[in-house]
Amino acid sequence: MAPPRCPAGLALLLLLLGACGFFQSYAVEVDVKDASNFTCLYAQWMMKFLIKYETNSSDYKNASLDLTSTVTHNGSICGSDTQAALLAVQFGDGHSWSINFTKNNETYRAEFITFTYNTNDTAVFPDARRQGPVTIVVKDAMHPIQLNNVFVCHHTTSLEAENVTQIFWNVTMQPFVQNGTISKKESRCYADTPTAAPTVLPTVANVTTASTTISPAPTTAPKPAENPVTGNYSLKTGNKTCLLATVGLQLNISQDKPLLINIDPKTTHADGTCGNTSATLKLNDGNRTLIDFTFIVNASASVQKFYLREVNVTLLNYQNGSVILSADNNNLSKWDASLGNSYMCRKEQTLEINENLQVHTFNLWVQPFLVKENKFSIAEECFADSDLNFLIPVAVGMALGFLIILVFISYIIGRRKSRTGYQSV
């Protein structure tokens, strides 16, 4: 199969951020036949998986799992009025994915997606601590589709659960096919419909979007973009809030030519996991920008503290789901505060993800552990916010003043010695 081509409208952005085809996935086409050799379930789509896994050194790494050129569909079922239809595929070294469909007299809908990845696949999961298959089940949010209509969605959609992000695009799917013929009637996803909001890239300084045309950024540094809007995010375990975060986020991409991207809270969905010693906040801005923040408790310290250990950023092509840029730093030690307290920093801070990507934060207030009554606990402020911050210029000024006085005294003493020498002659 020939490598996928980049959409023309995004060619420039891909050129700025990396080679087009750096991350690739194969299209899947499954045609399930019934006992009479008639098509009963048809699907063609593209998908990929972003997976965070633990290594033997207790660090976390991010893996990108793509479909291979060889995919089987063993176990797929046509379905009936009393039995769900099942679309199942197997690929790579022990990986599998399936989705089941149910119907009534008028409509059909997807119910559950089951994804199994095999951490024994060392090419994808090097040094994985957990060995063997890992299975997650996600409830699909697909709205009911009229029977004998084919579901079509070219735009990118994603599902996040248990450290796995599933990304889909270019989907054409019809279960319960009647008379063995794929329907000509289409039911489009909301993102594909003409009445939907126009597809735009995230807010990017010096990049203008008109339809799908992107103007080039200047060769100099980008003009300062407006500070990002501050968003409020939270995670729950059951009915109890377990993580709170308030922050404005801006990405600074310096690969080849600089770009600034503001994260829009209105289009950003928060997900993640809470735990006693680690917590992860996953932010998804319109299926275009994925940012994961992982917090760790330092239990070895005399006073237990939490801190930001890892940040992972992924930029997706909204048109076809391909990865434009992926960067990770799992060796951070930022935003530390005593366990049970919160961390606050109103001033701008910068997180270095790699040589090409920075994350700027504004109006930050975060508490990833021991949240009580859905409220932030006592805040420990960063040094930039503290009242002692003014002492730095004062101390520098005093040191310079002392140095000037010392030089002046040395000059006076030197002149006196000079005069004494002249008198003795």
Curated annotation (Swiss-Prot):
Pfam families according to UniProt:
Lamp2-like_luminal (PF01299), Lamp2_2nd (PF21222)
User: How does the record classify its membrane topology?
Assistant: Single-pass type I membrane protein
| Cellular localisation | Lysosome membrane; Endosome membrane; Cell membrane; Cytoplasmic vesicle, Autophagosome membrane
**GO BP, sorted A to Z:** autophagosome maturation; cellular response to starvation; chaperone-mediated autophagy; lysosomal lumen acidification; lysosomal protein catabolic process; protein targeting; protein targeting to lysosome involved in chaperone-mediated autophagy
PTM info: Extensively N-glycosylated. Contains a minor proportion of O-linked glycans.
**Region spans: Important for binding and subsequent lysosomal degradation of target proteins:** 416-419
Which spans of this chain does the record mark as coiled coil? none
- List the cysteine pairs that form cystine: 40-78, 153-189, 242-274, 345-382
Q: Which residues lie on this side of the membrane: Lumenal?
A: 28-389
Tell me, what does this protein do in biology?
Lysosomal membrane glycoprotein which plays an important role in lysosome biogenesis, lysosomal pH regulation and autophagy. Plays an important role in chaperone-mediated autophagy, a process that mediates lysosomal degradation of proteins in response to various stresses and as part of the normal turnover of proteins with a long biological half-live. In the chaperone-mediated autophagy, acts downstream of chaperones, such as HSPA8/HSC70, which recognize and bind substrate proteins and mediate their recruitment to lysosomes, where target proteins bind LAMP2.
Its family remark reads: Belongs to the LAMP family.
Its name, as the record gives it, is: Lysosome-associated membrane glycoprotein 2
User: What species is given as this protein's source?
Assistant: Gallus gallus
